[in-house]
């Protein structure tokens, strides 16, 4: 018997991707177990949306707006996970110290296992998002300075003089544009590094919830006895992902800084040559 069979409310025909279609969306009436079931449904739905956003990274749809939506969805899921974890603890305490029936305890144990499955999928989505956010840069549409058209003048000498002045001004603006490009790239790198740090914190939070979940399930017995064995693998994968994130961020920052410096030097040399020629 699955947890939705114990609900007194309605059944929803929509299957859940994490529990093989077993999970239904229950009506929450204040009972911790019902709230846990509703929380699991909302988390799994949000994780599905998160996966769709992650799959858009590296495509023409990968914009700053998409990255912002990705971060908001990540924070929303983290909040849902925290709330659902708290309700699961309530249900576990009630089973331990109350007069809950054996059927109720089994149903709550299955809820704990469903919650574990959702957390695993969320961890998988976070690792995939972190890898793609480091590998790909979002598409940014920036306005390029427009070229200048020389006005039509009466004499040839005035026309040439005007063209030279416009050319010099255009080259100066190109140097300024290069400076702005360097500043923009540095801001993008800093923003991505901040995002990586936030992802690391969220991964650690989810890993901590795995440990709390294992303790609750152990109190309930051996109904979900495979949770503890997954903790070590989850911790190792999280640690490896964190190390790779930091290495990739450091390498990207070094390469971007060198490229920007070379562009700036080239622009300055070009401006000096033009000024010397014109003088």
Swiss-Prot record:
Its main location: membrane. The lineage of its organism: Eukaryota, Viridiplantae, Streptophyta, Embryophyta, Tracheophyta. Interacts with VTI11 and SYP51 to form a t-SNARE complex and with alpha-SNAP to form a 20S complex. It is found in: Prevacuolar compartment membrane. Signal peptide: none annotated. Gene3D superfamilies: 1.20.5.110, 1.20.58.70. The chain crosses the membrane at residues 259-279. The keyword Transmembrane applies. Residues 2-258 are cytoplasmic. CDD domains: SNARE_Qa (cd15840), SynN (cd00179). The modification N-acetylserine is found at residue 2. This is Syntaxin-21. Keywords: Acetylation, Coiled coil, Membrane, Protein transport, Transmembrane, Transmembrane helix, Transport. It comes from the Eukaryota. It is a single-pass type IV membrane protein. Residues 21-31 have a biased composition (Polar residues). GO terms for molecular function: SNAP receptor activity.
